[in-house]
Structures are given as structure tokens and as C-alpha cells.
Amino acid sequence: MGRGAIATKHPLYVGNLGMHGAYACNMAVGECDLLFSIGTRFNDRITGKLHSFAPHAQIVHIDIDTAAISKNVQVDVPIVADAKEAILRMLEYVTECDTKKWLDEVEQWKGEHPMQMKKKPIMTPQDVIDTINRVFDEAIVVTDVGQHQMFTAQFIELNACYGKKIP
């Protein structure tokens, strides 16, 4: 799923998107002018109401499956390709631009609305996940579906995805 491709502590990491996601991530998608989506299904837990999802963005959707492109969200630039090949090809055209104002705004969202739960006198799922975060530098984490899946997605700190990460 790509979770961990950008380390949780990386300054550009904004968290998960959607109804169980981070405020900063949801705001970033809601305010962005360009959204790259790589292998994303755009299910309703991510998009919410389709008419209000990424309303200002041109959406680029990369997926190896033709049927996935524009299935749930109409995209502006459909790319049917292997993700690695598509990204490497697009990198040839990247130029620098001033992103300081945008990154400052995202950092402000992260600071004002961190993903955290209030401490309780009893053991909580977050306490278990905090322990995993402290004990293991790198772990492969698997969950079943349910609330524990959401707690894990929200609070697990990942440094790599199957040993691979974006620097």
C-alpha cells in the first residue's frame, strides 16, 4: 500500500488521507492545485463527497490497471503504467519552484492539529502502538479490519516500506 514509503518523521510526511486521516493531509488535498495519485482506488473513505474532493486540483492518476483510472474520481491526466517507470519518466521534466509558502502552511496545519489521543489511566490501543514504535526501528505491521486497523494506520511510525523509502 505504500505506507512507509515516506518515513513518518520525514518533514514532508502529512499523514493518511480521508475520514480516518490527518487534518493536515486532508487540508493539503483540499487546497492543492496538483494531486498525484499512484495506485489509489479513491474509495469513499478517502474522498468523502466526490464533488468536494480536491476541488482546486488537476489530478494525475498513475495505475497499472486501466479499469482503476477514473473509476471513482474523474482524473485530468490518466497514466496507465508501472508506477516506478511512470515516476522515473516524469522526474525528467521536474523543475524547481518556490514551495516555501505552501510547506509553511502545511506545517502550520500539522502543528495546530496533530494526530494524537488523550492519555488515559488504562491501557489503550495507542499505548500498544507507542510501545511498538519504541521497541522496533523497522517492523512489518499487519492488521485485520476494524478499529485496531484505524489506530494502527493513524499512530504507527514507519521508516520504510519493505525496506524501500523515498529519501
Feature-to-residue mapping (PLM):
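General N-terminal targeting signals
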Residues: Y13-V14, Y23, E31, S52-A54, ...
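Phosphate/diphosphate-binding loops
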Residues: G18-A68
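Phosphate/pyrophosphate-binding active-site segments
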Residues: H56-V145
